Amino acid sequence: MSLPQPTPRMAELRKPTSSLTPPEDPDSQPPSSKRLCLEEPGGVFKAGWRLPLVPRLSEAEKVWELSPRPFKGLLVSTNAIFDNSTDSCVEKSVSGKQICNLKCSNLKFQMSSCLQSPPSQSPDSDLRASGRSEAGLHDREAFSVHRSNSSKAGVSQLLPSTSIHDIHGIRNENRKQQFVQGRDNVHKENPFLDVTFYKETKSPFHEIKNRCKANSVVPSNKRENNISSSVLKISKSQNQPSLEIAKPSYFRDSGTISVPQFPMDLNSKMSSVYLKEIAKKKNDKKEAYVRDFTNIYWSQNRPDVKKQKLQNDKKTVEAENIFSKCYENDYPSLSSQNTCKRKDLISSNYCNCSSIQCNVRDSRKNFAILENANWEEAECLDSYVLTRLEKSQNWDCNVRHILRRNRGNCWIINNCKTKCENMKKTEEKWNWLLLLEIDLLSKEDYHCAKVINAYEEQSKLLVREILGSQTALITTVWLNGKGENDNTLQLRYNTTQKVFHVNNPFESFIIEIFYFHKSISGNKKDNSILTCCNILKCKKQIGIIGIQNLITRNMNTNIKNGILSIYLQDSVSEPLDILLKTNIAFLLNNFDSLTRIENDFELEEECIFKCMLYLKYPKNIVENHTAYLVKILTSSRLLEDNMKPMLKKRKLFRTEQVFEKSKKKLINSFSMTTQNTGFPIFETYEKIPLLMDFDDMDEISLIREITCQNMSCPQQVVNVENWAHYNSSTVKAHGNSCPQFIQNNRGYINENFYEVNMHSQDLNMERKQGHNKISNFDCEHIFEDLCNVRQQAIPASHNIIHNEETHTTSITQVLNFWNLLSEIEEKKYDLILKEEVKVTAESLTNSCQVHKDTKIEKEEKDSFFPMDDMFSVQSVSLISKEVNVEENKYVNQNYVTNTNEYESILPEREIANSKDFHRKNDSALYINHQFETGLSEGNDECFQDLAAKYLSTEALTIVKDFEMKRKFDLVLEELRMFHEISRENELLSTVETNNGQENYFGENDAEKVKMEIEKDLKMVVVNKIRASSSFHDTIAGPNMGKSHQSLFKWKTVPNNGEQEVPNESCYPSRSEEELLYSTSEKDCETPLPKRPAFLPDECKEEFNYLLRGGSHFPHGISRVRPLKTCSRPIRIGLSRKARIKQLHPYLKQMCYGNLKENF
């Protein structure tokens, strides 16, 4: 690419600095459309119109002594740079280059600028307009200068050889920096690359106030100069990386700069840094597409970088090496930069002036964004940038996190990606406590600290830090409250929803927002809440202590009038919401340490503490529902005297129905309420469901109900039922939330999972039946195979069959409960309670014994239960594995005894009214009798008759499945026998090898081998007989017919070491080969039946039975007989080349059956 020739216009601009023209000079003209060129290599530009020159690599540039490098921009105020006329001087180095040293006494930093011009380089050769002619560049508004009638400006130009430290500042007589004058007469700062430029405003320029500090450069006050900074919106394509480019003054306010793509080949001619602008009008808005900075990806391996070194200038060479390493290391991070999409953002690019260790263009590391909610009311901001030290991996601790008040506007610190890499390496924790304390102390009206949106990889570390400082944070919130804010203090953690996962340490969070309210009583001095809340720590921690500490231990309240109210608002994501809801009941069962009673206080029935549990479910509840959980204070010694009259006058417990639809629908129910008791029980005043539905759950509820009548009746049986029902998905997903909720992989309900959905007893039924009551309740119990059994009525006998684990836990809970009562009640009540506990324990143990005796190995079973005083058969989707007739008889006997007991318990008038009861009962007994006889005889017609007459469609399918399984078992047994015969043939195959060894061994050895083989065969036969007999004793047994019992009778045949062939019992006529088999009676221990072995009619019956799925061998399976013509053993049934007649008898049967079906 050839360089253009210099023009006289550019030569006029390039004069020494001493001849600079002030901006007030009317002779200073803006640059024309002509090309600008360089006058001489060592010259300095005239301070006219300053246009940004971007270095560009070409082959002509390789002769430069100083290689081009990316610029580092600084936000420097004009007063900071040009404060003193004596601070700036122009020196000339040994090599003839002019160096401009800038000194600022107030800021204590020095900046050196080395200027070099190439031999013949046009200053705007890099500024090209695509699709347009270069002659008309001044007519384009994208790069044209808007002039006004009142002021004019000059240009100062930068050469591409500018060093990293080089800052081009030019002083004039009025100590003002030369700016590009906008159309609104607003001066602009030096337009370096990647520097933040001031946005154009319509107010005149008065003065720029210097606010440079130790580690930050601050823009001036808006009230003084009405200057605000902005960052360009860079449209980032999906497949192309982009960079944030500062918005120069010669772009419009609404203009945006987008970076489409950049050449990745660093050595190509397209790798130079230049700007390509395209002006497009869209709704009076212009977009300038700027070519990306590709030269920043420097590599030391480039030949032009190695050759180009500046003589006698060590600083420039050092800066070159450092930046080459910096950009080479940060190459992948530059391609993944985010773009700013808002106009009202303040971007501060800060560079440490004392070193070159900070990468300005890496926006993820080096600058943060402060967002202001109301831009018009914004005050002057102290901008800050997180700096990174090159050698140490730790972030600078002196970085100031500033939280500014802006007339009620809440500032948001958005550091999504800062401090992420180094925190990951060094595992340092952010001091969240200090950050939140600054925010709380800086605000008086609204105490809300929005925690920085954390990076996803650092969520664990952040949560651990927050959990560690939780107590201190709550104390800080409480101490910072003033006056009217005591009732509205809150500490809010706002974190992204991406961080909330159940597996993360956020599982320890149960409640996100805590509201601390003073007591409602008039005397607030006695009601101080000091140590209120700790987060529920349910994972791998003591849950009881954490829940007890959650409720306040406020001891200095006035018990008679004070009411403690704690609002717990849940506004977290779904996983934490689920954890909270699953632990509600566990939280409610541990309210023993809620309060304590002072020594000289008499308990009254009205003096109670109300704990208001305020739950907010954004998805499920439209309105905020509250549930008042009432608990009367308990103290074993202080309440003993006061509770005696209460126990005598009224019942021990009185249950109430909370939900009207709980009998019909058992979901969303918290049906346990108690009232007027002296024990730790709860009451709900409003009919509001505490536990709501979820998308993935049907039921999440945990209720304990204890029903008992008046304690004056010593014969009353205390009925305490603890039934377990829990959703399997809930157990798997949220089982670890609490120690009481133990997770099991199968979803099996362990002994600690409880749900009771029970209804209150009917008093009228209790009066009619007396002590022999029938408790109506619906129970859904989950077995190991998740079989649902609904029991809608149970007789008076308490032998309820359910899991042994439930029995043991219920016994322990009964004992614990009555031990609690024994501390408060009198001795006579203690004796009554002990007797009742014994009765319940005996009934439970009896039910456990019944459960042990009736172990039926089924996944699902037929249940016969009473329903509305009538017995009916309801089948519950069963496929049984093994059913014994003896067990069925035992169950039927228990069933008959239960019906007899039920008839004896019910009044005679009820039995007389139910006329259909005996009919249904007789029909049920008849069904049972027919079922037993059908099983014993093995008659299929019995099942068909039962199915046609009495059974329903569901029961009919069950009977068919049962019959199919019975036939399938027979087929499996036949296969087992077939494999045993094949194993015997393998043993016989050893005879062939032994016959081959007779040449080497004597006849005695051959005889010994034959004797051993015969012994092995006999042992196999004996084992088969034992196995078949044991099999028929256990499985076939009485539930198989006599025809089935006669099957599979083995007939042992002593052999002489030769291969045996099975008896031919499947073809209707003999063939010529069948005459070759030996049929002597000596070879058989048991003779064949007297009737002929081969009858066509019998074969037809056998084949018909086989087609139905059975295996009917009336003559049994005899031992294989040897062939007369065979001189050596034959592997029958195992060779691939074997014929059909050489196969196993079982295979012959199957082949013949298939042929018959085909015909």
Swiss-Prot record:
UniProt superkingdom: Eukaryota
GO cellular component terms given for this protein: protein-containing complex
Region (Interaction with RAD51): 1111-1159
Annotated region described as Disordered, given as residue ranges: 1-35
Residues that span the membrane, as ranges: none
Tissue expression profile of the protein: Specifically expressed in meiotic tissues. Highly expressed in testis.
Record's subunit section: Interacts with RAD51.
Name recorded for this polypeptide: RAD51-associated protein 2
Organism of provenance: Homo sapiens (Human)
Lineage: Eukaryota, Metazoa, Chordata, Craniata, Vertebrata
